[in-house]
């Protein structure tokens, strides 16, 4: 009698596929929030597996701040065509004009928190009752305590004190009219799990995840790449370094890490040796306050 056992990556994959199928069963109008980063790319791969041989039964939604890395945008468009998925793109720039919002000021003027308004408007426009995201619990303490099925009220707000139990992988997606649920199929994955899975499954990624040369300036110990949105001050020293990105956000709030890792194996070896989380090492917007992420999520952020 033969025994069938899953390794840990196969167990994580099976859990995520189960969550995707729960979404399809429980919600009428789900959507997958897609940024062109490694986590949302992994979500698309898992969604294809969950519904194969059919197409992904919901659209990919990208909230474009206008400050995205060009490599991520090019990859987004290519992947949407490759998997034959509907791609919905909404611009933060339009929201700023329509709502007369104030643009962030300062040296690194991140539109990250303004994405919330565009996301909530998009949910209202398409009547989405579920938005699937690529957040993981190892990234940040606010995400660590959020459920896989995270209920948002009619204003898109999250109350961490009112979360539903998820015993025995039973997920409750029942909501009142106007509410919606954010679902995180890879909550239990780590950054290392994601990279090992990408290597095993031979998943394509944007080139910025691997070592390349960029002009950067140093800000509070972080390397911020120069671009049309990030310009040096007179006292900044411009450096040219070999860097890669651990996470992909806006160019104005995402720092690079110094690296020579040009292959998947080399990236994985670097991750194994690091003791700093990807957001802790690279996200400027998370350092605004101690509870920056939780505050954004309470107001409707991803």
Region locations from a protein language model:
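Nucleotide-activated chemistry modules centered on ATP-dependent adenylation/adenylyltransferase
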Residues: 1-302
């Amino acid at each position: 009698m033969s025994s069938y056992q899953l390794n840990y990556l196969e167990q994580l994959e099976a859990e995520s596929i189960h969550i995707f199928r729960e979404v399809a069963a429980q919600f009428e109008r789900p959507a997958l929030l897609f940024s062109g980063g490694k986590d949302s790319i992994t979500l698309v791969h898992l969604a294809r597996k969950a519904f194969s041989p059919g197409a992904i039964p919901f659209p990919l939604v990208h909230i474009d701040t206008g400050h995205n890395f060009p490599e991520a945008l090019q990859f987004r468009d290519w992947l949407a065509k490759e998997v034959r998925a509907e791609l919905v793109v909404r611009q933060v720039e339009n929201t700023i004009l329509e709502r007369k919002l104030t643009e962030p000021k300062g040296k690194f003027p991140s539109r990250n928190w303004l994405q919330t308004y565009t996301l909530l408007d998009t949910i209202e426009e398409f009547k989405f009752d579920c938005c699937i995201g690529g957040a993981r619990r190892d990234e940040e303490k606010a995400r660590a305590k959020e459920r896989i099925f995270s209920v948002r009220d009619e204003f898109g707000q999250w109350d961490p004190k009112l979360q539903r139990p998820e015993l025995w992988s039973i997920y409750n997606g029942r909501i009142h009219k106007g509410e919606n649920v954010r679902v995180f199929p890879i909550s239990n994955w780590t950054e290392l799990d994601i990279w090992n899975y990408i290597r095993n499954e031979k998943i394509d990624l944007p080139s910025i995840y691997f070592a390349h040369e960029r002009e950067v300036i140093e800000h509070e110990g972080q390397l911020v790449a120069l671009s049309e949105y990030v310009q040096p001050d007179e006292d900044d020293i411009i450096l040219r370094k070999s860097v890669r990105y651990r996470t992909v956000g806006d160019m104005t709030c995402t720092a690079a890490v110094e690296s020579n890792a040009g292959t998947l194996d080399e990236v994985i070896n670097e991750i194994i040796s690091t003791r700093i989380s990807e957001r802790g090492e690279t996200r400027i917007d998370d350092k605004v306050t101690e509870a920056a992420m939780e505050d954004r999520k309470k107001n409707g952020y991803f």
